[in-house]
């Protein structure tokens, strides 16, 4: 990637001096005249007047780096955008140049690390949160319409952080550069997040950044365009990012020219041609959103799915950004309405608002995440938990870890408050340096219902996250942590599952399936002439595994196998039916045989009748259990309603108390002002009394003189 911001791969034509990091600058006033687009034009360009505005128009000369306009168009589907025709012509300067470059397709290949689009958006939120140390108080994620085509949507991520000066701006747009690698409490360390996230969300991005200027430097503002469409359709053989910079001199924004004015104009023309903005004034107007400092990222040509619809859904919820496709499960959305305490587990995969609310373990008090005009409320999974237990995990120190690295993780686990509904919710939210890396990590994949309802939260700063921040590097430390989490979840579930309606778990035993042979003399009766007795025949009896876990779980009611003791009389009849304890009989003719068979039929009928009675009893007990569960659910809902009403009442009381305090403060202030006024009036009254007394004395004196 060319840090100079050039759109053409050529060497500088001017020897750089020591000014501004060794780059030669030429300042020109953009406001010298009535037209903000009044630029000096180089020889290879001309101008035309349209709507009283002067536009830069290239002459009919095809540059070396651009092939004829029949080049293939970039696919609007992300997973197909990296495909290229090997037979397509290669620009002449690419094939004849021995230089090794970063090919534009690397931008797309690098972005494929983000399988999940919301994970890419989270990277941009991380960058804004890191700017809290530079004064950032908010990040606003919004969407608007592309002015160039008037119909497509564009994504905007804006914060009021410290912004970037031209040097830092180019570092941000360079691959693999990061100042955060060794900073405390910073997840970012690879210098790759901005490029991968923007290219995963859309084919193109344009960045506006304004910096106050420190250490005596003037404020600056920069514009840079990272456009895969531009690089692909112009057949560039290296990743080029056109940029233009401005500096505030005498309260006027003037351009900063590196190397040559022609190069600056090339960059501006490229940005205007391939961006959503139609003029230079449109570009400069974007800085009006930033006030004194900040960064505004505009992502356009957003990716589409296989059906031609945008991957990001801006229509379903006007205050949210959601995903279409496999990440969206309508069943989970409906369940989230029924089970509010499980809402984040059920919706974070497709809803940015839900995901952003749990993205950070703690959010700075003065920092806001605004999504399409509405604040995202911070949510802690601890608020969704009950019967919480706290564990401490301290792994064995490895030689490669720094001595100051914190090697203790505090784990909190418990049941989700909706666990008594027996819905399949479980997993651990694992954070790294305050950032959620593994949301609802399912470590125990037990058969049946074991582990359901158990969720937890911990911060593990000693494990290295992957560069896409959607998982951890597979290391021995991670494997040990996973094993320990499984152990904690099993122990917690086994000891407390009965508290949410599951059958108590006993100590597990290893029962192996076995096949044995037992003689059954009665079941193989041979009524054959010449045979005086029946010969025992081996019969296979299958003994299945016995597992102390529930089976056939459904969201509302748990069904379990129960054993009921049948009275000894029925057991004896049962044994009689299967020939256990019945001696072999001799052949006494068909009459005796029919009598025996009739007797067996009668005993079987009694046994069937008893079993039917037991079945009816079990069905009655099941209905009673369902009724009790429904009553408990109703009571739970009433409890939640009462809790909500109590919360609202407390909020109203707090509001009234605040208003009372405000009225009391106003009353005290008015009283103080009244006292001051009264003191002033008393003082004036005393002064007036003194004046009256003096006048009276003068009158008396005057009268005395007249009498004399």
Curated annotation (Swiss-Prot):
Localization, UniProt: Nucleus
Keywords from the named record: ATP-binding, Chromatin regulator, Coiled coil, DNA damage, DNA repair, DNA-binding, Endonuclease, Hydrolase, Kinase, Nuclease, Nucleotide-binding, Nucleus, RNA-binding, RNA-mediated gene silencing, Transferase
Residue span of motif Nuclear localization signal: 672-679
Comp. bias intervals (Basic and acidic residues): 23-34
Co-factor(s): Mg(2+); Mn(2+)
Domain of life per record: Eukaryota
UniProt KW Kinase keyword: yes
EC number assigned by the record: 3.6.-.-
Protein name: Protein MICRORCHIDIA 5
Organism ancestry: Eukaryota, Viridiplantae, Streptophyta, Embryophyta, Tracheophyta
Name of the coding gene: MORC5
